[in-house]
């Protein structure tokens, strides 16, 4: 948990703590009903006069904001990888269908040039997202500055996931729209990529500020 011990210091007063679920005053209430990632529970935590002992302080006092940003920067690589995997799953599911099952006018729809162009474009974008993820992860592991690369990977991989999962439903037609298969689930799960670990607009802001810093003389 993060709490501000000295609001007069703004973000410099934020401190991290460990709070045990058995701590008096802490309760878990409403479980949210979500569009996607339903296997991961999102619940409301209530803190009613909760007292936290000093030994539960995590790290140094006043360093909570720094820790949180560090977690977010690293987490963005993971979210980018998650969204890339989602794109691959949505693509594979739809590609198998259009090249093996679905026919129109006597031929598989995957054989039509227009469909092949869409599939080729989607695959190119998925591969580009994957390389952005690999590059950000490589820099992180090497101890290099990776913040901009992580933001770019998350931004682009999230965009690709939403785009490809949506197209995949269209490629599959009615079979993509019903819940008998995973196509609609890929689409529902893709939206969170543009939200958690920093929204897409936050990624753009981060990238823009770092670019300005690089090019300002």
In which residue ranges do the predicted regions lie?
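Alpha-helical interface subdomain recognition
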Residues: 44-46, 63, 69-217
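Glycine-anchored helix-breaking recognition loops at helix->coil/strand junctions
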Residues: 31-35, 58, 99-104
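Active-site PLP-lysine loop of aminotransferase-like
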Residues: 5, 36-37, 76, 154
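Flexible, small-/acidic-enriched active-site or ligand-binding loops
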Residues: 22-53
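Exposed loop/turn and edge beta-strand positions of beta-sandwich/beta-sheet ligand-binding modules
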Residues: 13, 41, 151
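Long, acidic (Asp/Glu-rich), low-complexity accessory segments flanking structured domains
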Residues: 48-66
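Solvent-exposed alpha-helices and their adjacent loops that cap or buttress functional pockets
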Residues: 7-11, 35-39, 59, 70
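A short core secondary-structure module
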Residues: 1-28
């Amino acid at each position: 948990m993060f709490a501000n011990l000295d609001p007069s210091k703004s973000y410099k007063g934020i401190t991290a703590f460990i709070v045990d679920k058995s701590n008096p005053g802490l309760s878990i209430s409403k479980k949210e009903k979500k569009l996607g990632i339903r296997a991961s529970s999102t619940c409301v935590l209530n803190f009613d006069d909760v007292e936290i002992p000093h030994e539960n302080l995590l790290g140094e006092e006043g360093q909570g904001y720094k820790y949180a940003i560090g977690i977010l920067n690293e987490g963005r690589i993971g979210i980018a990888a998650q969204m890339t995997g989602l794109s691959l799953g949505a693509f594979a599911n739809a590609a198998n269908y259009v090249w093996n099952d679905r026919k129109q006018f006597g031929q598989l729809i995957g054989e039509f040039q227009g469909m092949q162009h869409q599939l080729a474009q989607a695959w190119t974008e998925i591969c580009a997202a994957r390389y952005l993820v690999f590059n950000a992860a490589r820099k992180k592991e090497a101890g290099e500055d990776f913040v901009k690369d992580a933001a770019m990977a998350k931004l682009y991989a999230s965009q690709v996931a939403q785009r490809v999962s949506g197209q995949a439903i269209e490629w599959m037609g009615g079979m993509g729209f019903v819940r008998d298969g995973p196509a609609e689930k890929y689409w529902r799960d893709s939206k969170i990529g543009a939200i958690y670990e920093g929204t897409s607009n936050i990624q753009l802001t981060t990238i823009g500020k770092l670019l300005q810093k690089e090019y300002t003389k």
